[in-house]
Regions:
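Ala/Thr-enriched low-complexity intrinsically disordered regions
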Residues: 6-7, 21
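Cysteine-centered motifs
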Residues: 9-11
């Protein structure tokens, strides 16, 4: 008799998430190094086409101060939410975002999301995105990874999240740190369904 694992059972019921052209999107920043990734994502989301919300963990604010000269620059109309306020619309399943990106994502945040912790609005929004079957993209930067990290990623993948590690592409001919960051951000935009030419595509270069 054939044995079915829990993983195979869960995978069989995960359906592709179809995103609208005009997104209500939440960009969440945690305390991992790599604030530039979040800044470049915000730079390339058109506020005339998308409703943009931002939330930051306490340590994210410290990283922003250390890594982004002049601080985080928000698109026109973007709303910055209080981490401790549960009055944000995406804190309820009745008004979830179309998509949420945690960029960069610490392993601590990933572990809390994987196990359903919701002690602040960032974690609650991720919990809502999962339970309402909305697009959730997590961009971890940690290396190397422990077995605990891998198991947490497995749980999140089975729950429907996308794990998109911040691994820059070096075939793009990048000349600056921003160019390298853009190769990651381009993949995030791709998974959001946002058309972009932020980084060269494979085989676009002259043969």
């Amino acid at each position: 008799m054939r044995n079915f694992s829990a993983a195979s059972c869960f995978c069989s019921v995960i359906w592709p998430i179809i995103l609208p052209a005009n997104l209500k999107i939440l960009v969440a920043m945690t305390g991992a190094s790599g604030a530039l990734y979040a800044q470049r994502l915000l730079d390339n989301l058109n506020p005339r086409e998308h409703e943009i919300h931002v939330v930051q963990s306490n340590y994210a604010q410290q990283v922003i101060a250390e890594e982004l000269a002049g601080g985080l620059k928000l698109p026109d109309g973007a709303k910055l939410h209080n981490l401790k306020s549960m009055n944000a619309p995406f804190a309820s399943g009745s008004n979830p975002p179309d998509a949420m990106v945690v960029i960069p994502c610490t392993m601590g945040t990933m572990g809390r999301i994987a196990h359903g912790y919701s002690e602040d609005v960032l974690l609650r929004a991720a919990d809502v995105a999962l339970k309402e079957k909305r697009k959730l993209i997590l961009v971890p930067r940690e290396t190397p990874l422990s077995l605990v990290h891998i198991k947490n990623m497995e749980l999140l993948l089975l729950a429907g999240a996308t794990i998109l590690p911040a691994n820059p592409s070096f075939y793009s001919g990048a000349k600056t740190i921003v160019d390298l960051a853009d190769t990651v951000v381009a993949r995030v935009l791709d998974h959001l369904g946002v058309k972009n030419d932020l980084a060269p595509r494979w085989s676009e270069e002259k043969e």
